[in-house]
């Protein structure tokens, strides 16, 4: 059986529920999905209201033994994971298998920093929300309800961006040199190019 291609999604700028619904559908269909930068996911509605909702959720617990659940995740990646779980039949084998195909991360850890990341236009805030509507960042909400690694994630992201900038600069330089090299030998290899074109080996 052919290996299933991994779909790497950049969570930044997407709406929580819409992205979760699309991800849930994809994992049920058998795709492996990785969502990075979960701290950049948006939630529609102003921040204060969303925080009140989450604080109300934190109060829901088992009176006699709170350690039995429900479990309240604080990290943005886990909050997103739980949202997707709510859209899956996770108590069945099929749902559990689908949930196992999902990976979520805060920031962009290796090896995903070197991979092409995609967006989902149907879930983007700029597409789905009116410009005047209020929204909140999942990272800020998580930080204010107990997530302890916002500063660490921000620092690591800044380092990653700096490395990516240097890599892109080098790549551009190499492309420029390659174009120049091709231009320099264009006249020398022209007769060979024509032969290859006549045989249909070069377009």
Curated annotation (Swiss-Prot):
Give the modified residues of type Citrulline. 59, 140
Q: Which UniProt keywords apply?
A: Acetylation, Citrullination, Cytoplasm, Phosphoprotein, Ribonucleoprotein, Ribosomal protein, Translation regulation
Give GO cellular component annotations, separated by semicolons. cytosolic large ribosomal subunit; GAIT complex
Q: Which GO terms describe its biological process?
A: negative regulation of formation of translation preinitiation complex; negative regulation of translation; translation
Q: What is its main location?
A: cytoplasm
Where N6-acetyllysine occurs, the residues are: 191
GO molecular function annotations of the record: mRNA binding; structural constituent of ribosome
- Name of a matching Pfam family: Ribosomal_L13
Phosphoserine is found on 77
Subunit:
Component of the 60S ribosome. Component of the GAIT complex. Interacts with EIF4G1.
Its family remark reads: Belongs to the universal ribosomal protein uL13 family.
| Main function | Associated with ribosomes but is not required for canonical ribosome function and has extra-ribosomal functions. Component of the GAIT (gamma interferon-activated inhibitor of translation) complex which mediates interferon-gamma-induced transcript-selective translation inhibition in inflammation processes. Upon interferon-gamma activation and subsequent phosphorylation dissociates from the ribosome and assembles into the GAIT complex which binds to stem loop-containing GAIT elements in the 3'-UTR of diverse inflammatory mRNAs (such as ceruplasmin) and suppresses their translation.
HAMAP family attached to this UniProt entry: Ribosomal_uL13
PANTHER family the UniProt entry points to:
LARGE RIBOSOMAL SUBUNIT PROTEIN UL13, RIBOSOMAL PROTEIN L13
Question: Which protein, by its recorded name, is this?
Answer: Large ribosomal subunit protein uL13
Q: Which organism is it from?
A: Macaca fascicularis (Crab-eating macaque)
Q: Recite the lineage of the species.
A: Eukaryota, Metazoa, Chordata, Craniata, Vertebrata
